């Protein structure tokens, strides 16, 4: 079984789990949560954090907890939609990590890869980095990690372009931070790159 078949199997498993969760949460109405009347897939619902006006908020941000890397500003956008081999290993490690869900700030140059997650432009930059707010619910963690893995295969760690956000309405503060999964992803990316280089070196011999 190759990596693409494994990823397809994982995706089917996730879809079954999502369908079971939706059946348990039904309250008697006949309207489907994930599809409209025409059977089209609906986008991830907006989160309240995406609709706030942050002009009067105090923004707290810094380097990532794992490497101290700040958010980077790039002159060009980066995105590709090719199947991701790395995503297979990332999902196998992070499938049970519910902290992957949440609202994230994504730097503008990386935002095209996250167009399926209801991106909303944030009117204030984080330092000198403009970006979008996206919402990742519990059922969209797999496609989210696939998008992160695609950028990872191009050399982009989420520490460079993404921060999770937490809003304290009482103190009017917004905290931009990295979860433990950022560090876990960086480790997986490192070992995946090492295996790719090893495979390439063996082919060149």
UniProtKB/Swiss-Prot annotation:
Record's protein name: Uncharacterized protein ORF22
Species per Swiss-Prot/TrEMBL record: Fowl adenovirus A serotype 1 (strain CELO / Phelps)
Region listing for Disordered, in residue ranges: 1-40
Biased composition annotated in UniProt, kind: Acidic residues: 22-39
């Amino acid at each position: 079984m190759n990596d693409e078949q494994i990823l397809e199997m994982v995706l089917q498993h996730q879809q079954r789990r999502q369908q079971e969760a939706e059946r348990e949460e039904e309250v008697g109405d006949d309207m489907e949560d994930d599809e409209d009347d025409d059977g089209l897939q609906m986008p991830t619902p907006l989160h309240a954090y995406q609709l706030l006006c942050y002009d009067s908020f105090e923004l707290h941000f810094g380097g990532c907890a794992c490497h101290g890397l700040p958010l980077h500003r790039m002159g060009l956008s980066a995105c590709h939609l090719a199947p991701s081999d790395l995503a297979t290993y990332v999902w196998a490690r992070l499938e049970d990590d519910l902290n992957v869900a949440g609202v994230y700030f994504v730097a503008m140059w990386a935002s095209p890869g996250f167009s399926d997650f209801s991106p909303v432009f944030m009117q204030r930059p984080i330092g000198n980095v403009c970006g979008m707010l996206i919402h990742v619910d519990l059922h969209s963690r797999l496609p989210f990690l696939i998008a992160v893995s695609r950028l990872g295969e191009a050399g982009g760690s989420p520490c460079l372009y993404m921060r999770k956000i937490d809003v304290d309405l009482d103190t009017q503060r917004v905290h931009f931070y990295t979860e433990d999964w950022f560090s876990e992803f960086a480790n997986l990316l490192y070992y995946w790159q090492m295996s790719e280089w090893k495979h390439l070196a063996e082919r060149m011999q």
